Amino acid sequence: VAKIGIIGLNGAGKSTLLKIIAGIDKQYQGEVVFSPGYSVGYLEQDPKLDPSKTVKEIVQEGVQPVLDLLKEFDQVNESFADPDVLEDPDKMDKLINRQAELQDKLDAADAWNIDNKLERAMDALRCPPEDQNVATLSGGERRRVALCRLLLQNPDILLLDEPTNHLDAESIDWLEQHLQQYPGTVICITHDR
């Protein structure tokens, strides 16, 4: 686990370096290699967000795998009322086993508190109201929403291009504490400490 700061003059290529590490910029000589299974998350200076979505929908993308598990868990539970399942012990056993697998995954992901987790993250970063359409957000508000989504994804390697831009002092303090405790690697370009 490393916390790395990239410093340099304007135009020196700091943002380009992060894009290369993130796999976005392919116009270079050399090779970036990650161990298999590592996830990389990248916050660019001007995040591209789907303008047709709400703030909450964008933030939820950060925990989409957990939301998908919850949806499947609900579908499995609804299947217990299916007459075909009730009459077939093999189908019932398969359903019970799948329910147990999903329950274990959901417990491990603390999925039962996902709404609270989303709300806390959005509050900490002073995100706009959850029902606000992304198309109406300012550049700074879009960055807050994108940062919130990225932090909820919890990637192994976090690439941050000036993450404190457009954040107030309280949000910067929260972010600094969060990054100090972050369990993965953080590579950051910033003009703050």
Describe the residue ranges of each PLM region:
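ABC ATP-binding cassette signature C-motif
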Residues: 1-193
